Amino acid sequence: MEQFLGIQLPRNTRGSVISEATYDWRNDRDRTMEHAKVSIAENNFSLFLGAGVSMSANLPCWWNLLAGMINRCKQGIFKEADLDQLTKVCCNSSIVMGRFIRMMMESKSNEEEFYQCLHEALYNGVDSYSSPLITEICHLIQFKRQQAQSIITYNFDDVMERALKSCGIGNYSIFGQNQPQQLFPVYHVHGFVPFENKENIKSLPVLSEEEYHRVYVNSYNWSNVEQIHALSRTTCIFIGLSMTDPNLRRLLDIANKDSEADPRHFVFLPCIDSFDKDKAAEVKNNEAMRIQKEMFEELGLRVVWYKGHNDELPKFIKALHG
């Protein structure tokens, strides 16, 4: 292959030797967990939270949120049942779908109606902010309060704020240029839609393609700056994120650029089982996980693999402060 391409192929990534043996993800996970425990005991840390955290409290995933908005739109042509077809129309892209919904509503709704539609689709009348995962995240902050610096969330909701408050942890939502108070900060880098519809804290979220591009291209956007600060100055723990967001990956690359040190951040990800119907499923799944692991190492991340989002993941978060 090297003779054919005229190049020398890499033998390792960040010191990880590529082996012909099957990747033992369980042993690798256990070693990574030990690294994580030591790291957050010795260093300040930040928590990066994604949709998986809010979904554990029965809030909708991104696609269900968009479907709920379609269903509540007053234009009357498309309904929630049309989501699969509309997804194809929008090239299977959630942010393109977000733009489609905005355009669909633009002539029929004002900004207030759009926000209200989003609020109803997000909460659907359910005042829920509790789950085993959220409880363990709160306990992690409680037990490591001196090291815990902030939450950076990509979620619109205030699930974490209400959960922290119920645990006696004073906190403050930051969703723009509002200045932090002397409380535990929760940064909403994609916008903020609290359960209690208060006029003075409404923040239109990053929902559609053009809004996403506006954040992406502006390196000095407050949300990009806060994420870079956390990535550069603290150990970061990623929970409930798919890690496919292009802007997040770009910021990780920037923060990790030219670094010769071992990966300093940690991401919890579900085990890969894409090849479950294949005869060589275990081998292929393990190999895919090995390659993914090395890809994330290039971004400065160590992977902690888990099997169950609702049972195993909370146990691993608990182990961080146990």
Which residue ranges define each predicted feature?
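Short, active-site-adjacent cap segments at secondary-structure transitions
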Residues: 54-55, 158-160
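Glycine-rich phosphate-binding "P-loop"
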Residues: 105-133, 204-219
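Conserved RecA-like ASCE P-loop NTPase motor core of nucleic-acid helicases/translocases
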Residues: 151-153
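Active-site-proximal helix-loop elements at catalytic-domain edges
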Residues: 1-26, 116-123, 190-213
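Short acidic/polar capping segments at secondary-structure boundaries
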Residues: 156-159, 165-166, 191-195, 241-244
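SIR2/sirtuin-family catalytic core signature
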Residues: 1-47, 53-57, 68-81, 85-94, ...
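A short secondary-structure junction signal
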Residues: 161-166, 197-204, 247-253
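Active-site glycine-centered loops adjacent to acidic/histidine catalytic or metal-binding residues
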Residues: 50, 155
